[in-house]
């Protein structure tokens, strides 16, 4: 009488496991850079959306008072920057009394940009030898104020 032995153990061989790990590694190598790219792109888009909301508040301030933040005449492309748009001197959320006809607040609060920095208003922002009034973010590297570089996100409000 012959005895037959059956091995009912099932599982993956070492080669099969290594191939599965290699496939997971390749997929991760493709997915992670794309994830980082879209995360960065999403932050830039969020910043642009917030800048457009600030622009609407800025326009309402200009319509009511004839002024931009820092009590500059609306449309004027000269003057000092405003680094904190939440301050009463900016006139968007509260007034320090220097905005006749103020009927705000024009925005509940000015958020920080997606990288944790304040948005700014610059009514003498220079691009290619032309002056603009602009609102902006210092972008992912957060370098500023008065240090404008390529990663800044700028929304032009008015030009000279």
Task: Please provide the spans of the model-predicted regions.
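Short, surface-exposed interaction loops/tails
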Residues: 59, 114-160
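Active-site and glycan-interaction determinants of carbohydrate-active enzymes
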Residues: 97-111, 138-146
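N-terminal signal-anchor/signal peptide hydrophobic helix marking the start
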Residues: 12-22
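C-terminal juxtamembrane segment of a hydrophobic transmembrane alpha-helix
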Residues: 24-42
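Conserved catalytic core of two-component sensor histidine kinases
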Residues: 21, 48, 55
């Amino acid at each position: 009488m012959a005895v037959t032995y059956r091995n009912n153990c099932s599982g993956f061989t070492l080669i099969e496991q290594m191939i599965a790990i290699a496939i997971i590694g390749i997929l991760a190598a493709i997915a992670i850079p794309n994830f980082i790219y879209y995360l960065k792109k999403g932050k830039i888009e969020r910043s642009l959306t917030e800048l457009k909301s600030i622009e609407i508040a800025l326009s309402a301030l200009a319509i009511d008072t004839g002024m931009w933040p820092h009590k500059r005449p609306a449309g004027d492309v000269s003057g000092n920057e405003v680094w904190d748009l939440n301050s009463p001197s900016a006139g968007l959320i509260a007034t320090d009394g220097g905005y006749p006809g103020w009927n705000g607040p024009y925005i509940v609060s000015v958020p920080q940009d997606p990288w944790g920095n304040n948005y700014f208003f610059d009514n003498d922002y220079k691009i290619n030898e032309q002056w603009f009034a602009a609102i902006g973010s210092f972008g992912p590297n957060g370098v500023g104020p008065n240090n404008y570089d390529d990663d800044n996100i700028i929304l032009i409000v008015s030009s000279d």
